[in-house]
Regions:
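Charge-dense, helix-prone N-terminal extensions
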Residues: 3-4, 8-142
C-alpha cells in the first residue's frame, strides 16, 4: 500500500515509499505549491521526483513548463523523466551541481525570469557562479 500525506508545504503531497534512488515523490497541485515546496526544502533535499499530470488528463497539477521555471528560480534543474501511469509522469528535480553546464534554453528562460522579478537568491547564486567561471557565456546547445 502506498501512503501519501500532505507535506509541510500547502498543495504538495509526498509519497512515503520512495523510488529506488530514495528520492521522495511529491505532487504539487499548481506552480505556487511547487514554489512553496522549494522555498521550504531547496537546501534540505538532494532531489525529488515531481509527479506531473499529463496535459490531456486535465488533473490539477503544476505543468512541466511551470515546474522548469520555478526550479530555475530556486537553483534546481530538471533531469530524467519517467512514465508513471495513464495520468502522470515523474520528472526528477535536483539542485544544480557545481560546474554543471547551462543550456542556451535555460539561459534565455532565466533572463526572462530575472526581468519578471521571479528569481530567488539560490537561483541568482547559480547564475553568479556560472558567470564567474565562464559557463554563462558559453551555454550548451541542445
Amino acid at each position: 500500500m502506498t501512503v501519501v500525506r500532505q507535506d509541510e508545504s500547502a498543495g504538495c503531497f509526498r509519497k512515503l515509499d520512495a523510488v529506488r534512488d530514495e528520492l521522495d515523490i511529491i505532487t504539487c497541485t499548481d506552480a505556487g505549491a511547487w514554489e512553496a515546496w522549494l522555498a521550504a526544502n531547496h537546501r534540505l533535499r538532494r532531489g525529488v521526483w515531481l509527479k506531473i499530470a499529463k496535459q490531456r488528463t486535465r488533473v490539477a497539477s503544476v505543468t512541466n513548463d511551470e515546474a522548469v521555471d520555478v526550479g530555475l528560480c530556486w537553483g534546481w534543474i530538471s533531469g530524467h523523466r519517467k512514465a508513471l501511469d495513464d495520468t502522470y509522469f515523474l520528472q526528477r528535480y535536483t539542485p544544480r551541481r557545481p560546474r554543471s553546464n547551462w543550456s542556451a534554453v535555460n539561459v534565455a528562460k532565466v533572463e526572462e525570469l530575472i526581468a519578471d522579478g521571479r528569481m530567488q537568491p539560490p537561483g541568482l547564486a547559480e547564475i553568479d557562479a556560472a558567470k564567474a567561471d565562464g559557463r554563462w557565456e558559453r551555454p550548451a546547445r541542445l
